[in-house]
Amino acid sequence: MSGWRLLLTRPDEECAALAASLGEAGVHSSSLPLLAIDPLEETPEQRTLMLDLDRYCAVVVVSKPAARLGLERLDRYWPQPPQQTWCSVGAATAAILEAYGLDVTYPEQGDDSEALLALPAFQDSLRVHDPKVLIMRGEGGREFLAERLRGQGVQVDYLPLYRRRAPDYPAGELLARVRAERLNGLVVSSGQGLQNLYQLAAADWPEIGRLPLFVPSPRVAEMARELGAQRVIDCRGASAPALLAALTSAA
């Protein structure tokens, strides 16, 4: 596996953790974060959502930043969390919640809303009178999960905790990094990260798009192919073990 030289594009803190795991496996990596996370100020409406947390039969946490920021709110308002189902769309997010002491339901395979919806344990949590679900996430984002749940008669509320933005890099920075460090693979962890990669590449995309591109889900894989990426590898998850398994298979 030591032949891989990867560009990591997650937010700073996540890049550092992933780089450490890859380094232990003998994989060289270089970090160029393509997503920055800015926490949002709490509004009175959001405070009310947290104070009413015990109204929800399930809380869905969609990302690691949402988990970290959501737990800060939970600690502030609920020293003893109410009894309800906590869910995440991936193992890495679940690990943050579990470290806090929560029991978490999450899909073993796949880091997306589709995989969560297919979980019997999640569907079981909705079989109550007047089911309500709170989704902790970033500002904006996919509506798929909420739409599907509302189609099942579930009331869905959002708790936006952060805003994503693309860091500023000079034109040509991406290709210059790839060439200077002889990188032979790219890793993205979300659809927005992929879009930011594509926009940063700009006129260099034809060359960048020829590199193997490791993505976390079938949805992001399809997005990458639509953008013209020539070799897309679906890791079926955004965790380090999922990426390492995909690297072994793709070698």
UniProtKB/Swiss-Prot annotation:
Catalytic reaction equation(s): hydroxymethylbilane = uroporphyrinogen III + H2O
Any GO molecular function: uroporphyrinogen-III synthase activity
Superkingdom, taxonomy of origin: Bacteria
Record-listed E.C. numbers: 4.2.1.75
Enzyme type, top EC level: lyase
Pfam family for this entry, one: HEM4
UniProt family annotation: Belongs to the uroporphyrinogen-III synthase family.
GO biological process, alphabetically ordered: protoporphyrinogen IX biosynthetic process; uroporphyrinogen III biosynthetic process
Range of residues in the leader sequence: none
Name of the protein described by the UniProt record: Uroporphyrinogen-III synthase
Keyword rRNA-binding: no
The protein's role, per its UniProt record: Catalyzes cyclization of the linear tetrapyrrole, hydroxymethylbilane, to the macrocyclic uroporphyrinogen III.
Lineage: Bacteria, Pseudomonadati, Pseudomonadota, Gammaproteobacteria, Pseudomonadales
UniProt pathway: Porphyrin-containing compound metabolism; protoporphyrin-IX biosynthesis; coproporphyrinogen-III from 5-aminolevulinate: step 3/4
Keyword Lyase annotated: yes
Subunit structure and binding partners: Monomer.
SUPFAM superfamilies: HemD-like
Disulfide bond annotation, renumbered to this chain: none
Keyword annotations from UniProtKB, A to Z: Lyase, Porphyrin biosynthesis
